UniProtKB/Swiss-Prot annotation:
Coiled coil: none annotated. It is an enzyme of class 3 (hydrolase). One of its GO terms (cellular component) is plant-type cell wall. The keyword Manganese does not apply. This is Aspartyl protease family protein 2. The gene is APF2.
Amino acid sequence: MVGRRKALLFSLCFFFLSLPSFSSLPSFQTLFPNSHSLPCASPVSFQPDSDSESLLESEFESGSDSESSSSITLNLDHIDALSSNKTPDELFSSRLQRDSRRVKSIATLAAQIPGRNVTHAPRPGGFSSSVVSGLSQGSGEYFTRLGVGTPARYVYMVLDTGSDIVWLQCAPCRRCYSQSDPIFDPRKSKTYATIPCSSPHCRRLDSAGCNTRRKTCLYQVSYGDGSFTVGDFSTETLTFRRNRVKGVALGCGHDNEGLFVGAAGLLGLGKGKLSFPGQTGHRFNQKFSYCLVDRSASSKPSSVVFGNAAVSRIARFTPLLSNPKLDTFYYVGLLGISVGGTRVPGVTASLFKLDQIGNGGVIIDSGTSVTRLIRPAYIAMRDAFRVGAKTLKRAPDFSLFDTCFDLSNMNEVKVPTVVLHFRGADVSLPATNYLIPVDTNGKFCFAFAGTMGGLSIIGNIQQQGFRVVYDLASSRVGFAPGGCA
């Protein structure tokens, strides 16, 4: 009797183990097309408040200091908010054009021989040589408001995980583009200081630049779209609400030209030592995170957090990978992709491998909008999605998107799920992160694209709704769903 029971239990166990796993079954989720449309250029969430800013200035003049705070939270707005005169269709078209330029520049940089890219911009008079820093891929997509100097003068700054330097326009200007706030004048700040040519900060720049008369450090950042900024490399106090961060090395640009219209400059969040996280690791424990909202369906602002509060308890982490060839970017290991609950055949870790000389790989980027995958992986993923979405009415291609659907007058539709399998972290995307509106007539497109190069990029559309955690102390990146609440 006992033997029969054991045999029966063994048979049942074998039967259940032989069944396909639940994850291999087709899986769908619901998209509500009528609830998602092209976002308008909504007003920025942090309109200048002269009273509070004046209060901060008076506090600092009297010697008050609030530098002890361990975490800082700031609102973020999309760069489209600075183009209030454009229609939703025009804004989306401009976004895709910016995205194409950025991806092209990153791909060009990644394809070069090992070593930092150097692009020379016009050399202004009085400069013995130029310092080239940062990467030639243009600015990011999100900006915040912060104070510069003492007393604090408030300006808008673009945040970008693909840049390694902090810089802003400074008076006097030889050439300056239009910005929404008065240009920062370092002569009116009590805490501004130039950096000697012999200092460690100056030596960390990609090449040595020195004003031979004043013996002070110079910097230059050149971008792939032809824009550039040149000026003095200096230190200054930055103010985030009521928190001061002293001695931040930044570029004070007196000669600037480019596409950074509206924002005063850029707060680099890359992996390099001169980025804002790189310089302030002792203050914020080498941790920061951001959460980017779906602007077509949420009135909440996006946000960025520096410090221990940046780390979500529910985040799933994947290790950061090192690439000396492009040490600014955050590389991760992508092992595969599932569509409709099933791993896409042929999309394996080998397609996304970062080789020994720095080619290939996958980066997480806040400034790229649409995720680009190496072409064989994209084609396999796209074809799997088309099969899973075969009941939806197809629509003509749109811009870089080759898989589009006519969802006009539809309240809800079932779409295949999409999961990105990183090393140690499976990230299940909401439907709104991969099937997005591209016009005001109900056309939705699969928001991925292929790339002919070897580098894949996880863009900010796919990051929406997740708190993306950069824990540099532990060399890892995490994803926490629902992190914008």
